[in-house]
A protein has these predicted regions:
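Alpha/beta catalytic barrel-like cores
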Residues: 2-125, 132-148, 152-163, 189-193, ...
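Short, well-ordered, mixed-charge alpha-helical segments that flank or form enzyme active sites
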Residues: 134-137, 164-168, 175-182, 210-213
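Catalytic beta/alpha-barrel core
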Residues: 170, 201-208, 323
Length: 383
């Protein structure tokens, strides 16, 4: 169980990296761009991201924060300065039937403050990305109010950690319900009812099949909500035919002047998919090979796609959240790929130039073993 270290110095520290510049000596410099990943750790065994026990076992945010403390150790050891926390970090925090869980955030105020202090000290950018069940544009007012309650809880945790405005809660626009324009209007209407604490944290992302980059830009124009550009989603769903470069820069321009924007990057899966098909008469299952679906995320990031994007955005300052299936392993591999194939891009992320081309056979073996171990754990949990 995580116990925060006591400190005699109660002076509040400044928010995390609100500005985009750092001062070293008398010289103003730009902080390196950051690479991040989401939730699960695959590079080290037994690092849980949240307390996933069922309600009868009394799960608690305090247990999740203990896991998060260990994750912070791993991030620091690998010089990773951006991380998306599990949106289930506070179990049942807003569940209407389990009011005994509703006070977890207040109960963990000291632990949250301590972890926030550590994040600020390490310049670690944190965020949440709630599930697809957070729908602000639903015609059902009950679902909208539940979504708002969940957003309020996640915003409160970031506030209790005393993090700056770079720590955000990322959402999608929601369902279309047969009319994209009306869906946008409902989202705008709901946004205007949100508390300032939620608005300060909330950012909106374009998606891969419903709300395009053009759609969320319209929502931004009406609300001022900052936008996250998702590269793979843009490639999969851009019916208006927007150009990539100008669109990304519009998204970045939607952020407040002193808050660094961030984007999402992933590569599409290209391999065949194995699907089980059950015969209705015999009830026997057979494996069927199907072509890939381009909205699916690959295990790793294609380095040359990433390099091309970064060169197209030369001079822009932003952080990149990687949404590859291999999580931290994909981030560490992309770093090495940048150093090898695009040293000028690697420098933007603060990575040193390679003096020689390394033999990667040992590293690849370690990655394969980690992925196999993760697959085995997943299989046991499913069983």
């Amino acid at each position: 169980m995580f116990k925060p270290k006591k400190s005699r110095n109660r002076r509040k520290e400044p928010p995390l990296a609100e500005g985009r510049k750092a001062v070293r000596g008398n010289v103003e410099t730009t902080e390196p761009l950051r690479l991040g990943f989401a939730v699960k750790i695959l590079g080290r065994q037994n690092l849980k991201s949240n307390d996933s026990r069922r309600w009868r076992q009394n799960p608690h945010l305090r247990v999740s924060l203990g896991y998060l403390e260990r994750i912070f150790d791993y991030l620091a050891a690998n010089d990773i300065r951006m991380y998306r926390m599990s949106s289930d970090i506070a179990p049942y925090i807003t569940h209407p039937d389990f009011t005994q869980f509703h006070g977890q955030i207040e109960e963990c105020r000291d632990e949250l403050r301590a972890l926030g202090r550590r994040a600020r000290k390490g310049k670690l950018r944190l965020s949440f990305h709630p599930s697809q069940f957070i729908v602000l544009n639903s015609p059902d007012p009950v679902l909208v109010q539940k979504s708002i309650a969940d957003l309020a809880a996640q915003a409160e945790m970031l506030d209790r950690m005393e993090l700056g405005s770079e720590a955000v809660v990322v959402v999608h626009a929601g369902g279309t319900y047969g009319d994209v324009d009306e869906g946008c209007n409902r989202w705008i209407k709901t946004y205007r009812t949100l508390s300032p604490k939620i608005r300060r944290r909330l950012v909106l992302e374009n998606d891969d099949s419903r709300y395009s980059a053009a759609d969320v830009l319209k929502i931004h124009d009406a609300t001022g909500v900052p936008l996250i550009f998702d590269h793979q989603h843009f490639l999969c769903y851009n019916p208006q035919g927007l150009d990539l470069g100008p669109t990304v820069r519009k998204f970045m321009g939607s952020w407040p002047a002193k808050v660094r924007p961030k984007i999402h990057f992933s590569s599409p899966r290209t391999e065949l998919r194995e699907l089980k098909r059950r015969d209705r008469k015999t009830r026997k299952s057979t494996l069927v090979l199907q072509p890939p679906v381009w909205t699916g995320h690959a295990d790793f990031c294609h380095p040359f796609e990433f390099i091309t994007l970064m060169r197209a955005l030369e001079g822009a300052e932003f952080d990149v959240m990687l949404e590859a299936k291999s999580k931290d392993l994909a981030l560490l591999r992309l770093r090495r790929d940048l150093q090898r194939y695009a040293p000028a891009v690697a420098v933007r992320f603060g990575l040193p130039a390679l003096r020689h081309i390394p033999d990667e056979s040992r590293t690849i073996l370690v990655e394969e073993n980690a992925l196999e171990a993760a697959a085995m754990r997943s299989s046991r949990n499913a069983g």
